Amino acid sequence: AVKDGERFIEAVRRAANVAATGRLVLFGSKPDSPHTGYGYIKRGASLEGFKGGAFTVAQFCEKPNAETAAGYLAEGDYFWNSGIFVLNAHTFLDEVARLDPRILEAARTALARSADDLGFLRLEKQSFAESPNISVDYAIMEKTDMAAMLPIDIGWNDMGSWS
C-alpha cells in the first residue's frame, strides 16, 4: 500500500527518467524497523545525474532473520524491496530473452494461441503453463546488470501474502 500518492507519482516520474536510460528500476523503501518479512536490496554505486538519487543494485537479499535485519538497518545501505518496477517494456523483454528465453517463448506462444472471449483476451492455458514457475526477481532482476534502485519515502508497506 502507498500512503502518499503525490510522492508516489513524483517517484514514478523520477524512475521513468532512469528507465529511459535502459535501466530496470525497482523502488526501495528505507526501512524504519528490522523487518523479517520483507526482502531487502543493498544499494550500490550512485547513478549520476538523477534528482533524488538512483543507484545500482549491489545485492538482493532474501527475507532475513531478526539479527541480520537489525544489521541491515544499522548499516543504512539496505532498503526494503517494494516489488514495484518502472521499466521500458522493450528493455525488459530484451533482458527476459537474454536471461531466460523460456519465459518469453512460452508467453509468445500463449499469446499467439489466445482467443477473444467476450471482449477478453484468453491466453492458451497449456502454453502459458509451460512458462517456468519463477518470479521476476529471481529470473531477471537478480541476474541483470541493468537493475537500478530508486529510494522512496511514500509511506509504503507490503500488503502481505495473497495466499
PLM segments and residue spans:
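Conserved beta-loop-beta/alpha segment of the NTase-like Rossmann-fold superfamily
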Residues: 1-47, 87, 94-99
